[in-house]
């Protein structure tokens, strides 16, 4: 509603923002300077908070609508990298079903990694990009 975002913004603290970002990175540490670099405090401005809440609230219905088409419509090379300790989007919620729906998909489960594999395992992410490029004939 119209009242909740300003209230949340008024009572949000730097500590709450830091805790939220830490939760996204867990179990890896947040890189030095990351919170300032991405402008994390901007997320609690009422207009931004409201927009994000709307997007999150509408995400699941869109995924439910799209998921049955994954196997037929994903004809491009598909690499999925997912941390086994991702508490934001657990492995069995999206990546395993996506891999199962798309016969040519490759799922790499990163042990001990949370929601930010591109920070935790950048070399493996680059390797996946290189595999996709090679499969697509771009290398």
Can you describe what each PLM-predicted range is?
Residues 3-5, 73, 100-101, 135:
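Alpha-helix C-cap/termination motif
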Residues 17-22, 53, 99, 126, ...:
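Non-transmembrane alpha-helical segments in soluble domains
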Residues 28-29, 60, 64, 133, ...:
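Secondary-structure transition/hinge residues
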Residues 32, 40-96:
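Conserved serine/cysteine hydrolase catalytic core
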């Amino acid at each position: 509603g119209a009242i909740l975002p300003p209230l949340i913004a008024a009572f949000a603290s730097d500590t709450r923002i830091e805790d939220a970002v830490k939760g996204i990175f867990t179990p890896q540490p947040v890189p030095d300077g990351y919170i300032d670099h991405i402008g994390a405090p901007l997320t609690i401005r009422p207009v931004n908070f409201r927009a994000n809440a709307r997007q999150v609230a509408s995400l699941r219905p869109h995924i439910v609508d799209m998921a049955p088409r994954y196997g037929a419509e994903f004809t491009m090379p598909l690499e999925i990298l997912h941390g086994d300790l991702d508490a934001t989007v657990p492995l069995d919620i999206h990546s395993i079903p996506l891999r199962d729906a798309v016969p040519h998909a490759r799922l790499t489960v990163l042990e001990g990694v949370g929601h930010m594999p591109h920070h935790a395992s950048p070399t493996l992410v680059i390797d996946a990009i290189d595999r996709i490029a090679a499969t697509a004939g771009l290398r």
